[in-house]
UniProtKB/Swiss-Prot annotation:
Protein's GO biological process: division septum assembly; FtsZ-dependent cytokinesis
Name of the featured protein: Cell division protein ZapD
Location relative to the cell: Cytoplasm
Kinase listed as a keyword: no
Annotated function: Cell division factor that enhances FtsZ-ring assembly. Directly interacts with FtsZ and promotes bundling of FtsZ protofilaments, with a reduction in FtsZ GTPase activity.
Organism encoding this protein: Burkholderia cenocepacia (strain HI2424)
Superkingdom as given in the UniProt entry: Bacteria
Length: 251
């Protein structure tokens, strides 16, 4: 099944973007070629841009504290797997402590480093990091891969608590949902939400159908419409019945 996820609010939308950026960063950092490490570094700059929002850290701390207070009363409950509960609570408490230790504006260390700041300013220009534009950066790219990797990992280190916090919030949100099998009649599906507030919607479709879900929602109703794309033309609405799995997640 192919999984599509749709955020219902700006906070979850930001966390999904961060998750995608951190996954891209980890993939390219693990490679050997300097061009791949260039992608890792520019992704680091993107992460700094997203995490530089003043209220992101406080939002994550408030959400983790809320989850801690929700889960802590289940300690000693015989109906709850205690080892799993303690693992989650320990992870939340450690991440909260790491967030509390973060000093200043997120990503400020990249701004304060003049060399990295010069690379960052050139990286937004198409072709702006050529060797004649940034000879010192080109020289750094000739260093051994492991040394480059250590440098980039060092520059990422101050932002890792935000990565961990985002991962916990998204995991708890995803685990809160119950999947149901539904059918989009003639490619369209709608469902009343009865005033319930959801954070995230997941749509899973069989890959052999080659359909693409488009979703929208408000506090009363959600809609899922399926399209299909042939080649490089704009996707068109389908008029066939489409079976899919729908999961609504609410922290």
């Amino acid at each position: 099944m192919i999984l599509y996820e749709y955020p219902f609010n700006e906070r979850i939308r930001t966390l999904l973007r961060l998750e995608d950026l951190f996954e891209r960063f980890a993939f390219f950092l693990a490679q050997e070629d300097p061009r791949e490490h260039h992608v890792a570094l520019t992704t680091l700059f993107e992460i700094a841009e997203v995490t530089g929002r003043a209220d992101l850290k406080s939002d994550l701390m408030k959400e983790l504290e809320r989850q801690r207070q929700t889960l802590a009363p289940f300690r000693g409950n015989p109906g709850i797997e205690q080892n799993a509960l303690e693992a989650v609570l320990g992870e939340i408490e450690q991440t909260l402590a790491n967030l509390a230790q973060m000093q200043g504006k997120t990503g400020q260390h990249l701004v304060d480093n003049e060399w990295l700041a010069s690379i960052r300013s050139r990286a937004v220009i198409p072709g702006g990091t050529c060797k004649f534009d940034l000879p010192s950066y080109y020289a750094w790219q000739q260093w051994p891969a492991e040394q480059r990797r250590q440098d980039i990992a060092k520059w990422m280190l101050p932002m890792l608590p935000l990565r961990d916090a985002a991962a916990i919030v998204l995991r708890l949100a995803r685990e809160s949902g119950q999947a149901s099998k539904v059918m989009a009649m003639q490619g369209s599906y709608q469902q009343m939400l009865s005033g319930r507030s959801y954070q995230l919607m997941q749509v899973r479709v069989p890959p052999e159908l080659r359909v693409i879900p488009e979703a929208s929602a408000n506090k009363y109703m959600l809609w899922v419409r399926f399209t299909m794309q042939d080649g490089d033309v704009r996707p068109r609405a389908v008029d066939i019945d489409v079976p899919f799995h729908l999961t609504l997640c609410n922290l």
